[in-house]
Amino acid sequence: KRGLIKDIERNYHVRIKKQVSFIRDWIFLCFFLGNDFLPHLKSLDIYHNGIHLLLSVYCFFIKKTKQYDNDYLILPNQDINMSLLRKIFNRLHKNEENYIIENIKHHKYKRNYLDDIPIRYCYKGWSNRYYDYYYKTHSFLYIDKIVENYFRTLIWTKEYYFKGCPCWKHYYKYKGILLSDMKE
């Protein structure tokens, strides 16, 4: 734990004042890179810069605060600081297409990335093609259902890791989603 915090302080030029709060946030941030319950966000890949991207943006915002309890992603009552999460998503979203293209270049010979060829990420309208390809629709109502299920599963996963399993019947039903849909 101390080694992780020292590395992050050194590499991201940030001073972590509340180590327990930071560790909770670190665990929570890693959910976006995928785990047994949630797929990774399409633009974030744990094998190619995903951790660095998340930490860079997270530390950018943490540096701007006094690091009071309510300045962290996971609040003392274990709720999610939606204001900070929204800021993180908005900042990451600005370069989402570039992150995806870099991930594809990095994984250009791996089957799951080759499946994405019809989406043509470099061309306008790629996010609609993404949903058309994987879900056969790009209806906002359907995408809202996907985002809602993602957030419910995100909260479920947070509860599972921090408090214990809230319900064994819950699961995430879809493929990874785009930051552009999460930022709202």
Where are these regions (language model features)?
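Long, low-complexity, charge-dense
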Residues: 1-184
